[in-house]
């Protein structure tokens, strides 16, 4: 799998959403190998999108379409500065509680790990126990970048359920796992709370 993370500052979330809705309507049918996208804008105007493709080749074919270029030329004008693109083939998808497209709340976390391999190993442990402890989590997509950087997308049933889940006392084994994960972070991660997530999949 190949993922492209697009982010930047916007001043009109509704206009950006209309542009992406337009892409789904007009361009998605011709985007062979596109698997789905999660996007949204935080309350302070930070836009982020995570687009998934079957392969890097499929993503490049999409980017090279004239209609894609024309669409992005117009959409880029909605950003208050330059949008950044970060590509990755280091992708782990974990779906435990249904269809991520049904999520009522999405949180994107970006940071840097001192040991990405160990962090990925920890994320894959005790998935059944985590699913039982946090039924509000539908699934996640973990994306590794150069230099230990990462983007993690977590899909929740609702923000209310997510906040309630955060307050629950963890079983000791899961707490130890979380403590080790946090200790691997270099600096403080950035959180993007998408209270109205845009969830797109091929029709």
Describe each PLM feature range.
Residues 1-48, 52-203:
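Short S/T/G/P-rich N-terminal loop/turn motif that feeds into the first structured element of a domain
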């Amino acid at each position: 799998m190949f993922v492209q993370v697009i982010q930047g500052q916007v001043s009109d979330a509704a206009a950006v959403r209309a542009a992406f809705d337009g892409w789904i309507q007009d361009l998605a049918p011709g985007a062979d190998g596109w698997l789905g996208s999660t996007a949204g804008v935080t309350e302070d105007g930070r836009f982020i999108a995570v687009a998934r493709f079957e392969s890097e080749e499929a993503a490049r074919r999409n980017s090279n379409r004239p209609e894609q270029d024309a669409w992005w030329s117009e959409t880029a004008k909605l950003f208050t500065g330059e949008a950044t693109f970060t590509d990755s083939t280091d992708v782990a998808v974990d779906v435990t509680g249904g269809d991520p497209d049904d999520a009522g709340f999405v949180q994107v976390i970006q940071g840097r790990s001192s040991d990405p391999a160990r962090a990925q190993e920890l994320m894959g442990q005790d998935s059944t126990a985590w699913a039982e402890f946090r039924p509000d989590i539908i699934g996640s997509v973990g994306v590794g970048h150069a230099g230990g950087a990462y983007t993690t997308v977590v899909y929740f049933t609702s923000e209310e359920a997510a906040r309630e889940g955060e307050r629950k006392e963890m079983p000791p084994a899961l707490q130890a796992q979380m403590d080790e994960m946090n200790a691997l972070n270099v600096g403080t991660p950035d959180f993007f709370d998408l209270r109205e997530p845009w969830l797109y999949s091929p029709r």
